[in-house]
Structure formats: structure tokens, C-alpha cells
């Protein structure tokens, strides 16, 4: 993630962490911001050409950390943004299972983009949508293994609410994923 400041009245002194929501290019960095309050709600009103200051990147949510040919990406809610960004960075020879968890279908904000990436991947990216409650779709070792049979032999990347990140961490530990193959970008300023 990066810390962002926007040079506009009411925003300049505020610094907020946002993850990239698409792979970076030479000309563009993209963020997707969920309306969670005054600051995030006001971002939509920024004028084109507004000067932006950013600091980072922070965390270890990069494809360079992967060492396996199987990758499990898990995104919950707005945590899908860095997951979506990293999904397009892996090249040929890497099999990706991506789990996108949301309470309702309306919250699957990047579904169209993920469907497109999966379609153009020639089968190397499989996207699994889990829509509903935690009780309907628990993030435990058995349920994840049903979706991603190579879970135990995968590099695991997860971003989302703290409870979901911890549930996936516990499941990964149960199936034998070592700490160095578990990468998270949790909401807030901690990284492991």
C-alpha cells in the first residue's frame, strides 16, 4: 500500500493508506476507494489535475515474494483491491486460485475486471466468488482446500477484514503453509 495526500482544501493535511487496484504502469497508478466516511466520500470530488503526494510502497504484498507455481489469492470486501492488482502480475507457469468474498453481490465491485482477467488467462487464473455470510462460507482449511486443492503447496496472499485474514492464516497453518509463504495486507498499518 501507499500513503496518499491530495493537494486540495480539506485533504492536504490528511494522509490515508490505499492499495493499488491494478498493476502499475509507467504512466498510471490506480486506487479504488470505498466510501467509508468523509475523506473517502470526498475523493470523488477531486478535480482532474489535483496534485497527489504518495509515500511507499509499504508491506510485502508483491509477486516477488512468491516461490511456488501455485498461488492462492484471497480478498474480502475492499481488500480485493491489492488482490486484483497482483493477480495480473503473475506470468505463465503460475496457477492462481482467487477467492473474492463479499456479503452481497452488490459488493463485488471488481467482478467484471476479475472475470476479464480470468478469461484472458487461458485457465491459469480461476476466480471463486463467495457471496453471503461467514457461516455460509467459512474460511477454514477444509473449505479453502475444496476451492484450491493445492492450498498446502501454494504461496498465500490475503487482504481484507482482520477476522478473515486471521481465519485464512489459521487455515494456512493447519495445512502446513510456512510463514514465509503467507503474505497479508490487512486493513491498518501492520504487515507480516
What are these regions (language model features)?
Residues 175-192:
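Short, flexible loop segments at boundaries between secondary-structure elements
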Residues 70, 94-97, 124-126, 155, ...:
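Residues at the starts of beta-strands that form the adenosine-phosphate
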Amino acid at each position: 500500500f501507499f500513503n496518499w495526500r491530495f493537494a486540495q482544501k480539506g485533504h492536504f493535511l490528511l494522509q490515508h493508506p490505499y492499495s493499488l487496484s491494478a498493476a502499475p504502469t509507467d504512466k498510471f497508478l490506480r486506487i479504488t476507494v470505498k466510501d467509508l466516511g468523509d475523506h473517502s466520500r470526498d475523493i470523488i470530488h477531486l478535480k482532474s489535475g489535483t496534485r497527489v503526494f504518495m509515500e511507499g510502497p509499504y508491506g510485502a504484498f508483491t509477486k516477488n515474494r512468491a516461490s511456488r507455481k501455485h498461488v492462492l489469492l484471497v480478498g474480502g470486501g475492499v481488500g480485493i483491491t491489492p488482490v486484483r492488482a497482483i493477480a495480473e502480475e503473475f506470468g505463465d507457469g503460475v496457477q492462481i486460485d482467487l477467492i473474492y468474498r463479499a456479503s452481497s453481490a452488490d459488493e463485488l465491485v471488481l467482478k467484471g475486471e476479475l472475470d476479464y482477467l480470468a478469461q484472458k488467462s487461458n485457465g491459469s487464473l480461476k476466480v471463486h466468488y463467495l457471496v453471503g455470510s461467514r457461516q455460509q462460507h467459512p474460511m477454514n482449511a477444509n473449505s479453502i482446500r475444496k476451492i484450491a486443492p493445492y492450498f498446502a503447496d501454494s504461496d498465500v496472499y490475503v487482504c481484507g477484514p482482520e477476522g478473515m485474514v486471521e481465519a485464512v492464516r489459521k487455515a494456512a497453518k493447519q495445512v502446513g503453509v510456512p510463514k514465509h509463504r503467507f503474505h497479508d495486507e490487512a486493513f491498518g498499518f501492520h504487515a507480516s
